[in-house]
Structures are given as structure tokens and as C-alpha cells.
């Protein structure tokens, strides 16, 4: 069976219904132009993703998460993936600064949901409902993904706020299971989200690597401590 390898993860088939999702220590930014390896990053992303998936499942969000298979490995359900990234934004940061005349750090009065077509060749362009329809994705499917994404946002924002963390923005991916249900997939980690310390606005995510803001592992470990209440490795 074929192993699928991306920039930060490997998908290793277990059987017809499940994959091992292995998180790598690689970090990339700017469409792979900037690259590095950080020992322990894969473990942190796997454990953080597992924590968030468990939290969401407890709140009724269906995910592809089945269990933890090892330090940097999760067992996940095999899905027919949509070629989309669904991005939810609560605070102005990143590429949103280029599209709205608002300063970085501006708290949006309500979340913004954006759609991006997953394509390395096209650099993941932003699309709308009309583009999605051309790609064979129905408005009903898009609306369901947006509905789930906004519920995820509410759950994570509340959980993180109690731990002194601002959920700035994040991206989600979705797939369809064998019963035709739309299920939350991929990962939820500091690779795919922006997390800021509520007091200092210090980044606790991959922006530390993108913009040389400090030690990536220290930032990820701090996030891990706050969301789990444990020290990494304990």
C-alpha cells in the first residue's frame, strides 16, 4: 500500500479503513522556500492534535481521530478528502492584513471564514462558492464545512481563553467517510493555527519559525503545557 508524504506528515495505510498519521520534525514556510528540522516537533504536533481532537469529540464534533499510535503517530479514519482548506479568522494577522485596511491584532467583530484550493502548483489560491462548484463541491457541502468550522472555533476559543491564549486564526481540512458524512480531518496544531499569548501577544505557533521570532520548540512546548497542564515528556 502506498505511503503518502507531505511537508510535515506521512500517511501510512494500516488497512482499508485506517491510516497511521506520522508527524515529522520538518518545518517549512513560504511554500517550502524556508526549511528546517526541529527535534521533538513531530511529537508535540501529534500530542497537541490528539488533545484538540479529543476535546472536539467531547463536544460532539466528528473527527477522523481514532487514537494515539506512538510518540509522533496518530491512528485516523480513512476519508475521501476535499481539496480545500477552510480558514477561520478571529484577529487580523497574516495574509488578512493585505486584504483589509485594518491593523494587525485588530479583533474582528465576528469570525471570517475563507476557502482555499489546495494546490502547491497554484500556491493554494483563495476561492469562493462559484469556484468550488466548478471543482465539483456543492454549496451544501461548503455550508456544512463552514458550520463545523465555526463550531470548532467556538469550542477552541473558549478552551484557550481560559488558558491565557488567543486563537487568532486556523485552517481545517475535511473529508467524507464511507457513510457520506463530512468529517473533520488533518491536524490541529501550531503548524496550522495562530496562537498568541493573551498578555504579551507573543506567538506560540509556526510564525516563530516563519519570522525568526525565537525558539520554535520552546513556543510549542509552552502551548503544550497550557493546553494539557503537563510538562512535555512527562
Swiss-Prot record:
GO terms for molecular function: ATP binding; phosphoribosylaminoimidazolesuccinocarboxamide synthase activity. InterPro entries: SAICAR_synt/ADE2_N, SAICAR_synt_PurC, SAICAR_synth, SAICAR_synthetase, SAICAR_synthetase_CS. It is an enzyme of class 6 (ligase). The keyword DNA-binding does not apply. Pathway: Purine metabolism; IMP biosynthesis via de novo pathway; 5-amino-1-(5-phospho-D-ribosyl)imidazole-4-carboxamide from 5-amino-1-(5-phospho-D-ribosyl)imidazole-4-carboxylate: step 1/2. It catalyses: 5-amino-1-(5-phospho-D-ribosyl)imidazole-4-carboxylate + L-aspartate + ATP = (2S)-2-[5-amino-1-(5-phospho-beta-D-ribosyl)imidazole-4-carboxamido]succinate + ADP + phosphate + 2 H(+). Keywords: ATP-binding, Ligase, Nucleotide-binding, Purine biosynthesis. NCBIfam families: purC. Belongs to the SAICAR synthetase family. This is Phosphoribosylaminoimidazole-succinocarboxamide synthase. The gene is purC.
Amino acid at each position: 500500500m502506498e505511503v503518502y508524504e507531505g511537508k510535515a506528515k506521512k500517511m501510512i495505510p494500516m488497512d482499508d479503513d485506517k491510516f497511521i498519521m506520522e508527524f515529522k520534525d520538518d518545518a517549512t514556510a513560504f511554500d517550502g522556500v524556508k526549511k528546517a528540522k526541529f527535534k521533538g516537533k513531530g511529537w508535540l504536533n501529534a500530542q497537541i492534535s490528539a488533545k484538540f481532537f479529543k476535546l472536539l469529540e467531547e463536544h460532539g464534533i466528528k473527527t477522523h481521530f481514532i487514537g494515539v499510535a506512538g510518540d509522533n503517530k496518530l491512528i485516523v479514519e480513512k476519508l475521501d478528502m476535499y481539496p480545500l482548506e477552510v480558514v477561520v479568522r478571529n484577529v487580523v494577522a497574516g495574509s488578512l492584513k493585505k486584504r483589509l485596511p485594518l491593523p494587525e491584532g485588530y479583533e474582528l467583530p465576528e469570525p471570517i471564514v475563507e476557502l482555499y484550493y489546495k494546490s502547491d502548483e497554484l500556491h493554494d489560491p483563495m476561492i469562493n462558492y462559484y469556484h468550488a462548484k466548478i471543482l465539483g463541491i456543492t454549496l451544501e457541502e461548503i455550508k456544512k464545512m463552514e458550520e463545523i468550522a465555526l463550531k470548532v472555533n467556538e469550542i477552541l476559543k473558549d478552551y484557550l481563553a481560559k488558558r491565557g491564549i488567543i486563537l487568532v486564526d486556523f485552517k481545517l481540512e475535511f473529508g467524507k467517510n464511507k457513510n457520506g458524512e463530512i468529517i473533520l480531518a488533518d491536524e490541529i496544531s501550531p503548524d496550522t493555527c495562530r496562537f498568541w499569548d493573551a498578555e504579551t501577544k507573543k506567538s506560540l505557533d509556526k510564525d516563530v519559525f516563519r519570522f525568526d521570532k525565537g525558539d520554535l520548540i520552546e513556543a510549542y512546548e509552552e502551548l503544550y503545557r497550557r493546553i494539557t497542564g503537563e510538562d512535555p515528556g512527562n
